[in-house]
Amino acid sequence: MNALIQSKVQCKKPELSETKCFKMHIGKDKLNCSNLEVNGKVMKTTNSEKYLGDVLSSSGKNDENVQMRYEKGMGIINSIMSILKEISFGQHYFEIGMLLRTSMLVNGILFNLEALNNLSVAQINLLEECDKILMRRMFDAQQGTPIEAFYLETSVWPLRHILMARKLMYYWTIIHKSESELVKEVFNAQRDFPTEGSWLSEVQGVLQSCNINYTVDQISKMSQAKFKNIVKERIQSKVLVYLVTLQNKHTKSENLHLDSKMQPYLRTEVLSLSEKKLLFSLRTKMLRLKANFSSMFGNILTCSVCKEVNSIETEFHLLNCSFIKKDKVLVNEMQQVAYEDVFSDIAKQTKVVKVFKKIMTIFDKQKTLGEKQNEK
């Protein structure tokens, strides 16, 4: 073995030394391991080593890699938000935001993960935490905003489903590789000698869950475009089931639905960026009102400004609040809208969000004044 290593060194002429070369043992039995050498010196033994940006571990675990991707993702989020704040994208703010999410965050933290196996649920959740943070910052959303709301409104896939699609497309790529390539030889070995926990067994599980029941021979005869369309269609169905499952656990997102495109109000030129963010808060019932955060206010939900008995501080109440109605100009506008308009067409959404914008200005001002008086 040492002679082979030395031969490779002489042929390739790389700058190798004992500081650059390590040996890593995989498995439990170390009795038959030889002492490998490079340039006449014994290689050092290591349990983990960074190679081409990823950490190779003797345990086969992905903890270090996932943690590195998470930390990288946090840096990418700051870069994306800097771009969105420093450059005025007008009505295209959210569209550009989703493009930056895909090109920078998704590609940055999911790069080559389709080739890894045994990613745990906890590890996938950690990577998705980056996505959640980006979404919240992009929408200026409260911490408790249901995560499915972001995906339903923007019509993008959660990271776990993007990773599924990438694994399946990598599966197609391997099938179409030459039999002489190393990756194809490994693939064939995993197919001929099935092992629980192997990359192929994991992909087969994804295929089954997506109801893609084609054989290797059938897939080998498919074009990339055809297989990609099949994958996209099946993953889209899984995304819908996943988001609806989450939605059923949260009443705040119950009126939202998944569309083929981003919601029109996020793309329109009629609304300003602040109005779009306000409309999102209205649609997800995440305005800073007592009824939306009842536990935070000890279930004391009386309106902070009118303080009427039996009044409950909700979006519905604000449209009928006696204190807000003291503004005689605004009261006429309030009578022309309903809370349900936030789920209607652009025309009605525009009217209702502009009314709520004025309402919240009065509400916040009076609430702040009341809090200062209470402090005295």
Give a label for each model feature.
Residues M1-K8, V55, R69, I76-I83, ...:
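Generic, well-ordered alpha-helical scaffold segments in large soluble proteins
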Residues N2-E15, S322-L330:
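Classical protein tyrosine phosphatase
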Residues I83, I87-G90, L246-K376:
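Family-specific functional microsites
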Residues V42-T46, I87-M104, T145, E153, ...:
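Structural motif
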